[in-house]
Amino acid sequence: MRLLKNNIILRLLNSYMVDSPQPANLTYLWNFGSLLGICLVLQILTGCFLAMHFTPHAEMAFNSVEHIMRDVQSGWIVRYTHANVASFFFIFVYAHIGRGLYYNSYKSPRVLLWSIGVIILVLMMAIGFLGYVIPFGQMSLWGATVITNLLSAIPVFGQDIVELIWGGFSVSNATLNRFFSLHYILPFVLAALVVAHFMALHIHGSNNPNGVTSNTDRYPMYPYFIFKDLVTIFAFFWILSVIVFFYPNLMGHQDNYIPADPMVTPASIVPEWYLLPFYAILRSIPDKLLGVVAMFGSLLILLVLPLTDLSRIRGNQFRPAMKFFFWFFVVNFIMLFWLGSQHPNTPYLEIGQLSTTFYFSFFLVIVPFTGLVENTLLDLNIKELDLNL
């Protein structure tokens, strides 16, 4: 303990991981941060090992993945772990954001913390998309073609940007090299943002389920919350082991086991499951440019929440109306997952348009309007109490 407090580097670690005071009433919903940290470490480690055996060449990429699976000792475990932890990474980050939305963790003084988190989410999606292309299977090729083509909707410079990304006039060897290089380096940028996120959290500490200051009732991180985190970490490793060993392709796409063929178009071109809600928003708008704007806007709109939430109460646990709208939003978001996996035909297109409308209405209309109504009712109730006194 003396070493932890005297050494310059270890003293910093001690202040963040050992002596850091946490609210006494934190629930298991606050465990997603530690799970995400474990996922990031696993992804970087397994990714580095996979990169040692992968060949970023259009004619050899698919075979090099098969080489990892068949010839490299325990290569199949490393690859399936990397692929499935990526899915868990997004499951945990969606749950982490959902908890932040429910308990209003984006409100002052944690605006910087929330903003860095949104940037992390956008970067994660970019890294996930790049990784989806790297095996250069059939869905990798056509997914890359469709998604990168979206940038052609940008006026004047769109097509030039697409060809710059491709390194030619179609997805080719140059594209694969670009994507592999970015997929390798961006996780380290992500790790730097996670450190910044952690530092921003350390300034004001964690929010808590009651939404009020908890400075008078806090416990140190170790041993109380470290052991609490270990419960969910061990549960995660158990579930991950079951999936890796028994259902490794549960969250993957079977078309990616077919080598990339630019002459054969898959029956349905879809991105990885964790991008489906935003893909559904993109397809629900007929105009290409507006669809791209809506897709990116559906992510960046999270940044405006600290401005649009006008309620004086932190968290939805004491707000019945907002609690109803929040769970309706969750159901709507799950529906967008489903719609993103369907063909853009009737009735999926119309349902997608309704779901997209509600998605944006939640942030721009429902959240501020509900806050104003609650504030007005609160003021009227206070005045009535004053008159009665």
Swiss-Prot record:
Entry binding sites for a ubiquinone: 202
Compartments it resides in: Mitochondrion inner membrane
Full protein name: Cytochrome b
Subunit comment: Fungal cytochrome b-c1 complex contains 10 subunits; 3 respiratory subunits, 2 core proteins and 5 low-molecular weight proteins. Cytochrome b-c1 complex is a homodimer.
Binding site for heme b b566: 96, 197
Role: Component of the ubiquinol-cytochrome c reductase complex (complex III or cytochrome b-c1 complex) that is part of the mitochondrial respiratory chain. The b-c1 complex mediates electron transfer from ubiquinol to cytochrome c. Contributes to the generation of a proton gradient across the mitochondrial membrane that is then used for ATP synthesis.
Lineage summary: Eukaryota, Fungi, Dikarya, Basidiomycota, Agaricomycotina
Sites where the protein binds heme b b562: 82, 183
Keyword Heme appears in the UniProt entry: yes
Superkingdom classification of source: Eukaryota
Name of the gene encoding the protein in the UniProt record: COB
